[in-house]
Amino acid sequence: LGGEPTLDPQVQEVLDEAIRIGRDDIYLDITTNLTNVTDYWLKSLSRFKDVQLQFSIDATGKTNEYIRTTSHWPQIEKNIRRYLNFEIESNTNWMLSFHQTVSIYNIFDFWKLHEWVESLRAEDKFNRIETEFGYHCYVLHSPAELDAKILPLEYRAEILNNFNQYRPNIKQTHEDTGIQSVITLLESNTRPEHADALFEYCKKRTKAVDKVRGHYIKKYIPHWPMP
């Protein structure tokens, strides 16, 4: 099933039926954007023995709200805490992980999400979670006009300089692998074929989308390279 599972009644129906027939041994692998969570949903998940929850978030604050237009960052923070608190209180042992896709919109401060995840890990009450929640980072490749590789080199240099101030905080673990792919992009001196044309198209596309939504990108992403 596609879409946001917490909003799809068919997903809840499947969980309810599995619980009814005693199939709590089913492995659940669920990806959610954290825009919605209910007590009934949490209690349903707690009935299963093997649950993996993947939180799909692209950034923090206003940047995430721009990329995920239906999201509201304070609600996202509230919802992740509901998951974490419920896991502690119900003594479940879910596998939790955050997944970020880096595009031309969020690359300007992509490390802020990792920093936020680290701040959650550092909270005393969440240190009690048996399985530490992970962070995974991926570079977007399609559509081409949103691929961060089309950024002019001067922007890459500025982003890399800003990132290097945070870089020492990243542990040498599997998390470093995903972030390293972004670093490789930023350190590269090459751009894709037709990068200039794609970059101009991206700016025009962004302006057109903003007009439809009634948004202005620089109010959400101040470093965005357009007036």
Question: What do these predicted regions represent?
Answer:
Residues L1-P9, I21-D39, S46-K78, M95-I104, ...:
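Core AdoMet radical
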Residues Q10-D16, T38-L45, D109-W111:
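Distinct, well-ordered alpha-helical segments
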Residues S142-Q165:
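PAPS-dependent sulfotransferase catalytic core
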Residues I19, K43-D50, L84-E89, R121:
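Acidic (Asp/Glu)-rich catalytic clusters
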Residues I88-N91, Y105:
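Conserved, well-structured beta-alpha core segment at the onset of a catalytic domain
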Residues I104-R121:
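Catalytic cores of alpha/beta
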Residues L160-P227:
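Radical SAM enzyme core and accessory elements
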Residues V14, I76-N79, Y83, L113:
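Alpha-helical packing segments of well-folded alpha/beta enzyme cores
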